[in-house]
């Protein structure tokens, strides 16, 4: 499956970055947290996990930041869907968590101060060509 990787080299970067493992953990954590979105944080208060995620993104070339993030978000979405089925979670709750994954992922480049990338243009549900 081509997934979000129309550029083969981004797929390679994604694999080299171990699928942005820290970013996946961070997205997973954010999706699971209830309450209103992330609190506005200066670089000083970045949780270590977020810092790791930012480091991973900084290693990508700018062109690949969004595709690799999209790949990470998709992986987390699948994890959450599987866990949701195991726990018999309501669809509503799952939808909510999945929305949060993409909300968080959309703004990661900005949170991480990635040069040239502010926001990844994920559309809300992102069926997209996968």
From Swiss-Prot:
CDD domains for this protein: AAI_SS
Keywords per UniProt: Disulfide bond, Seed storage protein, Storage protein
A Pfam family annotated for this UniProt entry: Tryp_alpha_amyl
The keyword Disulfide bond is annotated on this UniProt entry: yes
Subunit structure, interactors included: The protein consists of two chains linked by disulfide bonds.
Family, as annotated: Belongs to the 2S seed storage albumins family.
Physiological role: Inhibits trypsin with a Ki of 7 x 10(-6) M.
Protein name as annotated: Trypsin inhibitor
Organism: Mutarda arvensis (Charlock mustard)
Lineage, opening ranks: Eukaryota, Viridiplantae, Streptophyta, Embryophyta, Tracheophyta
């Amino acid at each position: 499956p081509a997934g979000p990787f129309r550029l083969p080299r981004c797929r390679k970067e994604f694999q080299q970055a171990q699928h942005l493992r820290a970013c996946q953990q961070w997205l997973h954590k954010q999706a699971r947290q209830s309450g209103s979105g992330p609190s506005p944080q200066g670089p000083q208060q970045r949780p270590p996990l977020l810092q790791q995620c930012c480091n991973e993104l900084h290693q990508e070339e700018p062109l690949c930041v969004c595709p690799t993030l999209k790949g990470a978000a998709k992986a987390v979405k699948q994890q959450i869907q599987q866990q949701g089925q195991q726990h018999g979670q309501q669809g509503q709750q799952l939808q909510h968590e999945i929305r949060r994954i993409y909300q968080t992922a959309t703004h990661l480049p900005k949170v991480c101060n990635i040069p040239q990338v502010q926001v990844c243009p994920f559309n809300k549900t992102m069926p997209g060509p996968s």
